[in-house]
């Protein structure tokens, strides 16, 4: 991106301003995993906001356990 702006600070700011992602209010794009930043498989119950993989790693520390085992 610096090559495109020609190392000019004003041009770099303009490029960053017009290419930043839109802030989402609804849908999958509005929610991210708080640990890794993924958008897929978010567990929102109890206000966790963790993806399924991160939840599986920290579930026991949070007090969740599997009934069968």
Curated annotation (Swiss-Prot):
What cellular component terms from Gene Ontology apply here?
cytosolic small ribosomal subunit
Residues annotated as signal peptide = none
Q: Give the top-rank taxon of the lineage listed in the UniProt record for this protein.
A: Archaea
Cystine links in this protein are: none
Among the GO molecular function terms of this UniProt record, one is: structural constituent of ribosome
Keywords per UniProt? Metal-binding, Ribonucleoprotein, Ribosomal protein, RNA-binding, rRNA-binding, Zinc
Write out the residues that bind Zn(2+).
Answer: 33, 36, 51, 54
Which cofactor(s) does the record list? Zn(2+)
Biological process, per Gene Ontology: cytoplasmic translation
Q: How is the cofactor bound?
A: Binds 1 zinc ion per subunit.
Q: Which SUPFAM superfamilies does the record match to this protein? A: Glucocorticoid receptor-like (DNA-binding domain)
Keyword Zinc annotated: yes
Q: Which NCBIfam families match?
A: PRK05766.1 (NF004424)
Q: How does it assemble?
A: Part of the 30S ribosomal subunit.
The entry's function note states:
Binds 16S rRNA, required for the assembly of 30S particles.
Family assignment from sequence similarity: Belongs to the universal ribosomal protein uS14 family. Zinc-binding uS14 subfamily.
Name of this chain's protein: Small ribosomal subunit protein uS14
State the organism's lineage. Answer: Archaea, Nanobdellota, Candidatus Nanoarchaeia, Nanoarchaeales, Nanoarchaeaceae
């Amino acid at each position: 991106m610096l090559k495109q702006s020609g190392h000019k600070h004003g041009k770099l700011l303009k490029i960053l301003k017009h290419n930043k992602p839109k802030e989402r209010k609804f849908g999958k794009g509005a929610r991210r995993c708080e640990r890794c930043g993924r958008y897929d498989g978010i567990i929102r119950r109890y206000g966790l906001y963790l993806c399924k993989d991160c939840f599986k790693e920290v579930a026991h520390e949070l007090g969740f356990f599997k009934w069968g085992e």
